[in-house]
Regions:
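N-terminal secretory/targeting leader peptides
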Residues: 12-106, 122-327
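Signature of the catalytic double-stranded beta-helix
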Residues: 110-123
Length: 327
């Protein structure tokens, strides 16, 4: 539980320190994550008595892979997107997205924040990280049935930069595109499958284009999300207002986790209502997928260790945090 220790700013202070901020995300206007960050903004506006005002741009300003750089350069004051849209820019945070068997968004969100707070990677020093969150267990969603590993051979799968390695390891062909392109890619037959949590089936309407969701709990991955602010804009805020930002952001971390898990449940019901199937791989089949995916983890460790970073320690830490959060 987060207990408020920062009183709302006085009306006089609000008049004196009025600040307008642009917030950009790749999510669509009606997506649950968009609605949640808009509530975040309203809460900050309320607690600062209007000293801060937000203008939101959901899915209509910057693409997901442009948002981080947009925050750094000041094209947007605040942005929410995923680390995996920017190749090799976030070698430390990349450890979060490895196929390590996340059971829920609650666990994944706890892990990513604890991991960040432990390492404070320099790769994020050019922004102010307000908070992080992560979706529920990622799985494969396909147009054709997939019951065994061999069914993936030659299949074109919409992937992020990070999940493209998993796609290759399983014998399929990655097509690296942001989430917003997935519906049309599936509709046009350019890809036969995509990665994502169950949420994408309803939140992005992908249940209209796929027939099967394949769940292997041993390689359930997540995608790490950042909410980052331009450093110059952050430093221009008064200490009191910065305190409000940090307090509200801390309160919103579990809200995102709950929203992700609830949207997974709703999407499960939705896709089944359309006649789609959820294929749960048995332990023997799932073990084969896990063995095939292991090189993704091994290659990450080798690549990042070469740059002088303790990648094996990162992976070990993530595994420990998953186990701890899942208890």
């Amino acid at each position: 539980m987060v207990i408020s220790v920062i009183p709302a700013l006085s009306a006089g202070a609000a008049e004196k320190q009025s600040t307008d901020l642009i917030y950009t995300t790749f999510f669509t206007p009606k997506h649950g994550q968009t609605l949640l960050v808009e509530e975040w903004g309203k809460e900050i506006e309320k607690r600062t008595n209007g000293a801060v005002h937000f203008t939101f741009h959901p899915g209509d300003y910057l693409q997901g892979d442009q948002i981080y750089e947009g925050v750094v350069l000041g094209a947007t004051d605040i942005g929410m997107s995923v680390f995996s849209y920017n190749i090799k820019r976030f070698p430390v945070m990349e450890a979060i997205d490895l196929p390590l068997g996340y059971p829920s968004a609650k666990v994944a969100t706890s892990v990513i924040n604890d991991f960040y707070n432990k390492y404070h990677p320099k790769e994020l020093d050019n922004v102010k990280i307000l908070y992080l969150h992560a979706h529920g267990p990622g799985m494969l969603h396909s147009k054709a049935p997939v019951y065994k590993l061999e069914d993936l051979k030659g299949m074109r799968i919409r992937s992020t930069v990070f999940t493209s390695a998993l796609t290759k390891a399983l014998g399929a062909i990655p097509v690296v595109k942001p989430q917003g392109f997935t519906y049309v890619l599936l509709q046009d037959g350019y890809v036969g499958a995509t990665w994502g949590p169950l949420e994408v089936l309803k939140g992005w309407r992908l249940a209209e284009q796929i027939k099967y969701s394949i769940w292997c709990k041993r390689i359930g991955y997540t995608t790490g999300f950042y909410v980052a602010m331009n450093l110059k804009k952050w430093n221009a805020l008064t200490k009191d207002i910065q305190g409000v930002f940090e307090e509200v952001s801390a309160e919103w971390i579990p809200k995102h986790a709950v929203a992700w898990d609830e949207s997974d449940k709703a999407a499960r019901e939705y896709t089944l209502s359309l006649g789609n199937k959820i294929v749960v791989l048995d332990d023997e089949k799932c073990s084969r997928w896990q063995q095939a995916a292991q090189p993704v983890i091994d290659n990450y460790e080798k690549r990042v260790e070469k740059s002088g970073l303790p990648a094996k320690e990162y992976v070990s830490t993530v595994k420990e945090l998953i186990q701890k959060a899942a208890q």
